[in-house]
């Protein structure tokens, strides 16, 4: 499977260069056999990347399949390849998932949760018992 003209293998990158890499990508692959929470997926989605990830660990919670990205069967190269091909073949779908991913991640931002907790505390303080 020769994809060297269209794929750049980045390898492990220092934290300070990640945003630069995300800005250069359309699709982020996470073919993990096991995965914790999925922070990489969240970072990628916050930067408008569409995540194609294994259906494992916390990834199904983060990557809403068919809404903000795509999930594939763990260990299935064919399933992963089909998901990638569907995105490349349908640019409007890629753009839709990219836009939805940004919107989705913003709903769970630190600032948003801080404001929600702040509002909750204010209501609790001002509520008469």
Question: Positions of the model-derived regions?
Answer:
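Short hydrophobic beta-strand element within catalytic cores of glycosyltransferases
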Residues: 50-53
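Short alpha-helical donor nucleotide-sugar binding micro-motif in glycosyltransferases
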Residues: 12-13, 20-25
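Conserved acidic donor-binding segment of nucleotide-sugar-dependent glycosyltransferases
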Residues: 65-66, 70-77, 86-91
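Nucleotide-activated donor-binding/catalytic signature segment of Leloir-type glycosyltransferases, i.e.
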Residues: 1-13
